[in-house]
């Protein structure tokens, strides 16, 4: 039996987003940044690195982490600003993560397009995107997370009535 394309939608409000702006785009920069963050016992969930702005040699790196870990990560990064050479640190505690989950995504092109279209039609901006073979996650403003979940549920038919389950019982004889 083939797995359904999408088996569920999950959401998470317990994360913060940290963006390190103006990171020198050189080998080892990300390694050093995440070694510093690891030293604070911060668990990283999603990571996005922008393409370097042409001619600047600088990039931005954003990541999400549990909201209880973000203060330590921010403090450690600020303390290492001179060593790391970044321009500024931005912090956003008002984010939510929506994840679309399903083993069937591997063999069905267009799932991400459908997800992004559903969010677009609802007027919801995406801040970060992360994918794997069985999951697509997006970060959106926390204020619209519930609306995002409803829009995606509707787009993938997860809000439809499921088939009726019929149970036949016997006497056991």
Q: Predicted segment positions?
A:
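A conserved regulatory-domain signal marking ACT and ACT-like small-molecule sensing domains
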Residues: 1-173
């Amino acid at each position: 039996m083939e797995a359904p394309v999408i088996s569920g939608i999950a959401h998470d409000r317990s994360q913060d987003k940290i963006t390190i702006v103006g990171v020198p785009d050189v080998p080892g920069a990300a390694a050093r940044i995440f070694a510093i963050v690891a030293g604070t016992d911060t668990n990283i969930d999603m990571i996005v690195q922008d393409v370097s702005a042409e001619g600047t040699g600088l990039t931005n790196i954003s990541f999400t982490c549990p909201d209880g870990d973000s203060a330590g990560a921010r403090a450690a990064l600020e303390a290492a600003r001179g060593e790391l050479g970044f321009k500024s640190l931005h912090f956003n505690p008002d984010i939510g993560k929506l994840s679309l989950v399903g083993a069937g995504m591997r063999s069905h092109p267009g799932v991400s397009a459908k997800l992004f279209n559903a969010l677009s039609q609802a007027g919801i901006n995406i801040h970060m995107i992360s994918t794997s073979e069985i999951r697509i996650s997006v970060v959106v403003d926390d204020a619209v997370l519930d609306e995002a979940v409803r829009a995606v549920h509707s787009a993938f038919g997860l809000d439809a009535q499921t088939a009726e389950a019929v149970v036949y019982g016997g006497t056991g004889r």
